Amino acid sequence: MPVKIKIEKKEKHTRARLGKLTTPHGEVETPIFMPVGTQATVKTMTPEEVKETGGRLVLSNTYHLYLRPGHDLVKEAGGLHKFMNWDGPILTDSGGFQVFSLGPLRTITEEGVEFRSHIDGSKHFFTPEKVMEIEQALGADIAMAFDECAPYPCEKEYAVAALERTTRWAERCKRVHKREDQALFGIIQGGVFPDLRERSAKELLAMDFPGYGIGGLSVGEPKELMYEVLDQLMPIMPEDKPRYLMGVGSPDCLIEGVVRGVDMFDCVLPTRIARNGTVFTHNGKLTVRNAEYARDFRPMDQQCDCYACRNYSRAYIRHLIKTDEILGIRLTTIHNLHFIQHLMQNIRQAIREDRLLEYREDFLKVFNAG
């Protein structure tokens, strides 16, 4: 099996697990946060800079890379690792979420999804087989099965149909996925309905994927509902398979996910808000582009030792962002990724020492106060 997880420690008071995820491109510690490199790049960053922030496993996007530059071109370049000069592990999502986000631009049938490109309106058709062809050409260490992501809120009837189709599509993905140096993960759906989540999990667990994504959360539902789904789902998940909560990356959700037994996370949030001039700090979010920081010569976060906080002030970074200088959003991105990776490092240490609940309380008390 190209990808497997070895659980090294279970936290005494929670479901949290400390593990090592082995992939064809090296071993990474879990719980892990994956920076998102939608178009084969973590926006504004070089691979070396991503590594300096603590990033070890990155995510890239099947839908976007299929449209531009095309999966055949990436294959010709020697695969995604060579193309983007990243020597660590990569995960590609299946494009399911992106396609379903297109709303009126897409039509779902049993065979697959017809959609119009958000770039030029051209027509395309994704089937599970087509998505497997694309992901195998990209050659990431982990490929996600093609799923149907039900929106929130949605009728139970719709959630059932999406769940059933996700199961059938997972079977089709598994049938045609042949690449031996790539692991195919299944994705559990079911909306916010506990019985449907359980059903989806059981159907996918029966297919014995080497790992499982939990999809269809963080799509607008209240956080409490997401936590309820995890509380109910995690006890039935196999101990020896990685569990990946898709699209989740705010500091509070990362901690709450780990407490419930999640191993892997990804999210555009840290990099996206950085480009809007907002950063995470130990005292909550700070919008550094705001006028109140024009004469503030302190670092963005006084407790942070990232490159940006060691060298630049809020006033300077605000100036860069206000004048549309690219360095500004590079510095906020470096900081946010460093902040999240540092948080994950602290979480792993807290699991090691069986004090995750104390860490959660201490961190959130100060973070939420901001």
Swiss-Prot record:
Tell me how this protein assembles. Answer: Homodimer. Within each dimer, one monomer is responsible for RNA recognition and catalysis, while the other monomer binds to the replacement base PreQ1.
Cofactor binding note? Binds 1 zinc ion per subunit.
Instruction: List all disulphide bridges recorded for this chain.
Output: none
Keyword set for this entry? Glycosyltransferase, Metal-binding, Queuosine biosynthesis, Transferase, tRNA processing, Zinc
Q: Which family does it belong to?
A: Belongs to the queuine tRNA-ribosyltransferase family.
Q: What catalytic activity is recorded?
A: 7-aminomethyl-7-carbaguanine + guanosine(34) in tRNA = 7-aminomethyl-7-carbaguanosine(34) in tRNA + guanine
Q: What does this protein do?
A: Catalyzes the base-exchange of a guanine (G) residue with the queuine precursor 7-aminomethyl-7-deazaguanine (PreQ1) at position 34 (anticodon wobble position) in tRNAs with GU(N) anticodons (tRNA-Asp, -Asn, -His and -Tyr). Catalysis occurs through a double-displacement mechanism. The nucleophile active site attacks the C1' of nucleotide 34 to detach the guanine base from the RNA, forming a covalent enzyme-RNA intermediate. The proton acceptor active site deprotonates the incoming PreQ1, allowing a nucleophilic attack on the C1' of the ribose to form the product.
As recorded in Swiss-Prot or TrEMBL, the protein's gene is named tgt
Q: In which pathway does it act?
A: tRNA modification; tRNA-queuosine biosynthesis
Q: Which region ranges are annotated with the description RNA binding?
A: 247-253, 271-275
Query: Which residues act catalytically here?
Result: 93 (proton acceptor), 266 (nucleophile)
A Gene Ontology annotation in the biological process aspect, one of them, is:
tRNA wobble guanine modification
- InterPro entries attached to this UniProt entry: ArchSynthase1/Queuine_TRR (IPR050076), TGT (IPR004803), TGT-like_sf (IPR036511), tRNA_ribo_trans-like (IPR002616)
Alphabetical list of Gene3D superfamilies matching this protein: Queuine tRNA-ribosyltransferase-like
Give residues annotated as binding substrate: 93-97, 147, 189, 216
Stated name of the protein: Queuine tRNA-ribosyltransferase
Cofactor (UniProt): Zn(2+)
**EC number(s) recorded for this UniProt protein:** 2.4.2.29
Q: Which source organism?
A: Desulforamulus reducens (strain ATCC BAA-1160 / DSM 100696 / MI-1) (Desulfotomaculum reducens)
**Where does the source fall among the domains of life?**
Bacteria
Q: Which GO terms describe its molecular function?
A: metal ion binding; tRNA-guanosine(34) queuine transglycosylase activity
